[in-house]
UniProtKB/Swiss-Prot annotation:
The gene is CMP2. The keyword Chloroplast does not apply. This is Serine/threonine-protein phosphatase 2B catalytic subunit A2. Binds 1 Fe(3+) ion per subunit. Binds 1 zinc ion per subunit. InterPro entries: Calcineurin-like_PHP_ApaH (IPR004843), Metallo-depent_PP-like (IPR029052), MPP_PP2B (IPR041751), PP2B (IPR043360), Ser/Thr-sp_prot-phosphatase (IPR006186). Present with 7110 molecules/cell in log phase SD medium. It comes from Saccharomyces cerevisiae (strain ATCC 204508 / S288c) (Baker's yeast). One of its GO terms (molecular function) is calmodulin binding. It comes from the Eukaryota. Residues 501-523 are annotated as: Calmodulin-binding. Calcium-dependent, calmodulin-stimulated protein phosphatase. This subunit may have a role in the calmodulin activation of calcineurin. The lineage of its organism: Eukaryota, Fungi, Dikarya, Ascomycota, Saccharomycotina.
Length: 604
């Protein structure tokens, strides 16, 4: 046994014997209790348990509530009903989209077989569509949804009934939000019902790589099973990549590519696969305009310059994208960021009017970029249809209604939705670090009933004190009341003499203490999940302007601050092996913090 272990054992032995010989301490005087709190305590007192109405309970604020009814009765109750096939499907096998909409609104679930059936039907339908679909006007174009089901319902209220309104969605239906499955299945059911005027494109999040890294896979494992998740990923591989709207607009999730010279290049792709990390397919789903897209860098750019621009130029003996048109996309970690010159060149070559895309959160829900020189029309338009993205951005959502050659942008705000804990944890899993930490604090408090002075090695030998009426110092006091040796019962004496029990007790307490310190670290990490939500107050901290860059960052708008902190999640996630290494490093870091905490305490 190490010297530290021996010392700790001796201290625990001394503490146990001192506790055995202490007199019962007088109860400390209590402070006056607030009259209102006294009333509440009296109302809930167990003294009147026999006559108490157990169907009524008095809260701390004095309100009396019923114990057999929901307190928040204004919030619709979650339905536990799993629909039958007759309720869910029409005689022709197509799902009843109105029933599904209302069922999901009450957080209802489907059976695994029903979910698989809808996904399989949608996959078969997508597989028959070309990479580049043609959609006529009038039409309503929508951007990212990201699992915000209740906002999706609001979108249809603003945009019009899907039964009578044509829709084109630009991808990113899943991840980040807590209702990705509901969004996906409801959109798939609308596609199955209205195939002639309802279209869905693929976004960069519609792939196994991103959904495994973000929230969709965890959601599917929590709500259903791995088989349904795999079927959803298969359906993603069948989604079309782009749309030609009214023969004038290229609609795509991400942007253009140096490899995109004609629209036929899109149809030449093999899309039935996982999204690659480079190439034309990657760029269509991942590309962004550069940050300086609207800045007047091309004021002298002529139509001839645009026509003569080259997307690919010789570089070190091989062809590479022109730096005037495409630069590596450092924000995403893959694909390219394209310039105004690149967009104008593409529109000139294809004869199109503009590019409509999604992929980036916008404070107003949309952004129109610099006009083309030839037609004076916005060369690029970004749409984002997830309001208050991540419950943090405080942004508006927008959709585009296009009819009779007129564009009409409609904005809407977020809709309240049910709350889920991060990673779909239940309340017990969420609270375990807190409970573990508090339990160990209680154990430590029990051990700390004796002062350090009482446990010092130079304290009179405990064996000499047992059986005498010698005064023992009380914890936190210079004197102690005498305690007759006869107060110790034979049972207690036998326990105190059991060396193995004392050592086992000590080892258990130290082990729990170490686990508790790990819980403490994990609790801090758990709290960081809510870090972005702390930025929602909108209040500038005192002294922010005097704190340099950090203070100025805090003075930014809610949207900009949230976007800045969430920027790391806009990148292409690491591979599975890289993720395993990151998790390994994370837990090594947790244990390192625990060991550092131990070393710090030992040095005191």
């Amino acid at each position: 046994m190490s010297s530290d272990a021996i010392r700790n054992t001796e201290q625990i032995n001394a503490a146990i014997k001192i506790i055995e010989n202490k007199t019962e301490r007088p109860q400390s005087s209590t402070t006056p209790i607030d009259s209102k709190a006294s009333t509440v305590a009296a109302a809930n007192s167990t003294a009147t348990e026999t006559s108490r109405d157990l169907t009524q309970y008095t809260l701390d604020d004095g309100r009396v509530v019923s114990t057999n009814r929901r307190i928040m009765n204004k919030v619709p109750a979650i339905t536990s009903h799993v629909p039958t096939d007759e309720e869910l499907f029409q005689p022709n096998g197509i799902p009843r989209h109105e029933f599904l909409r209302d069922h999901f609104k009450r957080e209802g679930k489907l059976s695994a077989a029903q979910a698989a059936r809808i996904v399989t039907l949608a996959t078969e339908l997508f597989s028959k569509e070309p990479n580049l679909i043609s959609v006529p006007a009038p039409i309503t174009v929508c951007g990212d949804i990201h699992g915000q089901y209740f906002d999706l319902l609001k979108l249809f209220e603003v945009g019009g009934d899907p039964a009578t309104t044509s829709y084109l969605f630009l991808g990113d239906y899943v991840d980040r939000g807590s209702f990705s499955f509901e969004c996906l299945i409801y959109l798939y059911s609308l596609k199955l019902n209205f195939n002639d005027h309802f279209w869905l494109l693929r976004g960069n999040h519609e792939c196994k790589h991103l959904t495994s890294y973000f929230t969709f896979k965890n959601e599917m494992l929590h709500k259903y099973n791995l088989d349904i998740y795999e079927k959803c990923c298969e359906s993603f591989n069948n989604l079309p990549l782009a749309a030609l709207m009214n023969g004038q607009y290229l609609c795509v999730h991400g942007g253009i590519s140096p490899e995109l010279n004609s629209l036929q290049d899109i149809n030449n792709l093999n899309r039935f696969r996982e999204i690659p990390s480079h190439g034309l397919m990657c760029d269509l789903l991942w590309a962004d305009p550069i940050e300086e897209y609207d800045e007047v860098l091309d004021k002298d750019l002529t139509e001839e310059d645009i026509v003569n621009s080259k997307t690919m130029v010789p570089h070190h003996g091989k062809m590479a994208p022109s730096r005037d048109m495409f630069v590596p996309n450092s924000v995403r970690g893959c694909s390219y960021a394209f310039t105004y010159r690149a967009a104008c060149h593409f529109l000139q070559e294809t004869g199109l009017l503009s590019i409509i895309r999604a992929h980036e959160a916008q404070d107003a829900g949309y952004r129109m970029y610099k006009n083309t020189k030839t037609l004076g029309f916005p060369s690029l338009l970004t749409l984002f249809s997830a309001p208050n993205y991540l419950d943090t951005y405080n942004n508006k959502a927008a959709i585009l209604k296009y009819e009779n050659n007129v564009m009409n942008i409609r904005q809407f705000n977020m809709t309240p939705h049910p709350y889920w804990l991060p990673d779909f944890m239940d309340v017990f899993t969420w609270s375990l670090p807190f409970v573990g930490e508090k339990v160990t604090e209680m154990l430590v408090a029990i051990l700390n009933i004796c002062t350090e002075d009482e446990l010092e090695n130079d304290t009179p030998v405990i064996e000499e004190l047992v059986g005498t009426d010698k005064k023992l110092p009380q914890a936190g006091k210079s004197e102690a009341t005498p305690q007759p040796a006869t107060s110790a019962s034979p049972k207690h004496a036998s326990i105190l003499d059991d060396e193995h029990r004392r050592k086992a007790l000590r080892n258990k307490i130290l082990a729990v203490a170490k686990v508790s310190r790990m819980y403490s670290v994990l609790r801090e990490e758990t709290n960081k999940v809510q870090f972005l939500k702390d930025h929602n107050s909108g209040v500038l901290p005192r002294g922010a302007l005097s704190n340099g860059v950090k203070g100025l960052d805090e003075a930014l708008s809610t949207f900009e601050r949230a976007r800045k902190h969430d920027l790391i999640n806009e990148k292409l996630p690491p591979s599975l092996d890289e993720l395993k290494n990151e998790n390994k490093k994370y837990y090594e870091k947790v244990w390192q913090k625990v060991h550092e905490h131990d070393a710090k305490n030992d040095s005191k």
